[in-house]
Amino acid sequence: MDKTVLDASLEPLKGKTIAVIGYGNQGRVQANIMRENGLNVIIGNVKDRYYDLAIKEGFEVYDIGEAVKKADVAFLLIPDEIMKEIYEKKIAPILEGKKEFVLDFASGYNVAFGLIRPPKNVDTVMVAPRMVGEGIMDLHKQGKGYPVLLGVKQDASGKAWDYAKAIAKGIGAIPGGIAVISSFEEEALLDLMSEHTWVPILFGAIKACFDVAVKEYGVSPEAALLEFYASGELVEIARLIAEEGIFNQMVHHSTTSQYGTLTRMFKYYDLVKEIVKDEAKYIWDGSFAKEWTLEQQAGYPVFYRLWELAVQSEMAKAEKELYKILRRKVSD
């Protein structure tokens, strides 16, 4: 099988009822694009504002269990941390009675780490967008596709890969974007590696830069924030990386900048690599999944404590004042 898919047929999904479970960030976007593509879509959601929104936008909306009963295909587009409980209570009992069914996940986490184990009669596929719902819709309105990872954990019908590719087309990823053949385990590893390594390292580096510049060198908080991220330069660099490549975009910076970046990247590389290796192992062997499950069961004590430390930091307080001056969105 080719590792990339640039287009596919919708035929496997035609005539089937597709239940999108969760009308939030991904669910709303995927449901609307599939409806535009002529597919029969219903929504399964708890009775909240998203339930009401789906009705307002013209969908038939049901309790989650009822939606699964009516469907041939279900997309589980609810947060990872609540998915296991909802699956076990409202979805699993119904799947046992289905002769043939397709269950689609937008992330690999719950299946990869054994938190959800669909019955053997169910095609278990993954179509995982590599961007948030708002970004997907922006590209869709421009007639463009976007990248997704495809995976099959269980091929009960012998057609699971056909379903996965058809879903990628149905939600507007292809044509125009790219679908990369992957796996639940690979997606979960890569997603968590980002969240556990370069993202916190970047955030931590920015906070350390702020603290050192302001506290030890007397730099004004406003100047520090604007230099490190508030000006929007970081966003522009990220855009250039996506469009031109991480090293190719460096030509847009001064030679001084290029020299400083390259010398320090290689200077700290071995240190950073060891951090990445440790985190990757911790993710891959299931240790993080256990840690996160215990944190949830305990009522999120570490999560809330660290959030409080972050928002009460001097950088966060200075940011709030600067953003008021700049008339940007400020959370209370």
Curated annotation (Swiss-Prot):
EC number(s) on file: 1.1.1.86
The reactions it catalyses are:
(2R)-2,3-dihydroxy-3-methylbutanoate + NADP(+) = (2S)-2-acetolactate + NADPH + H(+); (2R,3R)-2,3-dihydroxy-3-methylpentanoate + NADP(+) = (S)-2-ethyl-2-hydroxy-3-oxobutanoate + NADPH + H(+)
GO biological process, any: isoleucine biosynthetic process
Which UniProt key words apply to this protein?
Amino-acid biosynthesis, Branched-chain amino acid biosynthesis, NADP, Oxidoreductase
Residue span(s) of domain KARI C-terminal knotted: 183-329
Instruction: Give the Gene Ontology MF terms in alphabetical order.
Output: ketol-acid reductoisomerase activity
Q: In this protein, which residues make up the domain named KARI N-terminal Rossmann?
A: 1-182
Class in the EC hierarchy, top level = oxidoreductase
Could you name the domain of life of the organism this protein comes from? Archaea
For whether the record's keyword set contains Amino-acid biosynthesis, the answer is: yes
Pathways per UniProt:
Amino-acid biosynthesis; L-isoleucine biosynthesis; L-isoleucine from 2-oxobutanoate: step 2/4; Amino-acid biosynthesis; L-valine biosynthesis; L-valine from pyruvate: step 2/4
Q: Which family does it belong to?
A: Belongs to the ketol-acid reductoisomerase family.
Name recorded for this polypeptide: Putative ketol-acid reductoisomerase 3
Supply the source organism's classification: Archaea, Thermoproteota, Thermoprotei, Sulfolobales, Sulfolobaceae
* Gene assigned in the entry: ilvC3
